[in-house]
């Protein structure tokens, strides 16, 4: 569960290393976001020659959360930390060309197919 002020790792090669959630998209009363949701983030830490720089505001898709993800078959999955992938505001395509670490298959239901195809492992 991601809310405003949550810090997340970046799981792509866009140049950002750490981001902070500044808004959860999807209605004025929406407080939390989970895997597959789109949030607005501010870049807090970035690589020197990346595509993005510190202070930029971008949209991101959450790909891993430390909070359990419950599946219809009764299984749950959780990760050690929270991670997101930066996306283009207009097209919804990832800014980076590679994705690091596993992502969950719930992204398929939310139509983030490009992220799934770039990921090394889908859990």
Curated annotation (Swiss-Prot):
Entry GO terms, CC: cytosolic large ribosomal subunit
Keywords: Ribonucleoprotein, Ribosomal protein, RNA-binding, rRNA-binding
InterPro entries linked to this entry: Ribosomal_uL14, Ribosomal_uL14_bac-type, Ribosomal_uL14_CS, Ribosomal_uL14_sf
GO molecular function annotations of the record: large ribosomal subunit rRNA binding; structural constituent of ribosome
GO biological processes: translation
PROSITE patterns the record matches: RIBOSOMAL_L14 (PS00049)
Signal sequence residues: none
Gene3D superfamilies: Ribosomal protein L14
Listed Pfam families: Ribosomal_L14 (PF00238)
Quaternary data: Part of the 50S ribosomal subunit. Forms a cluster with proteins L3 and L19. In the 70S ribosome, L14 and L19 interact and together make contacts with the 16S rRNA in bridges B5 and B8.
Homology family: Belongs to the universal ribosomal protein uL14 family.
PANTHER family referenced in this protein's UniProt entry, alphabetically: 50S/60S RIBOSOMAL PROTEIN L14/L23, LARGE RIBOSOMAL SUBUNIT PROTEIN UL14M
Function summary: Binds to 23S rRNA. Forms part of two intersubunit bridges in the 70S ribosome.
Designated name of the protein: Large ribosomal subunit protein uL14
The gene coding this protein: rplN
């Amino acid at each position: 569960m991601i809310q405003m002020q949550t810090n997340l790792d970046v799981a792509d090669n866009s140049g950002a290393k750490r981001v902070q959630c500044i808004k959860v998209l999807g209605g004025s009363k929406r407080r939390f976001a989970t895997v597959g949701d789109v949030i607005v983030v501010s870049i807090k830490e970035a690589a020197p020659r990346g595509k993005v720089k510190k202070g930029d505001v971008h949209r991101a898709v959450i790909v891993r959360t430390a909070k359990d993800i419950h599946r219809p078959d009764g299984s749950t999955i959780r990760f050690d930390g929270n991670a997101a992938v930066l996306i283009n505001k207009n097209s919804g395509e990832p800014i980076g060309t590679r994705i690091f670490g596993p992502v969950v298959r719930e992204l398929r239901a939310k139509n983030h197919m490009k992220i799934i195809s770039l990921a090394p492992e889908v859990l």
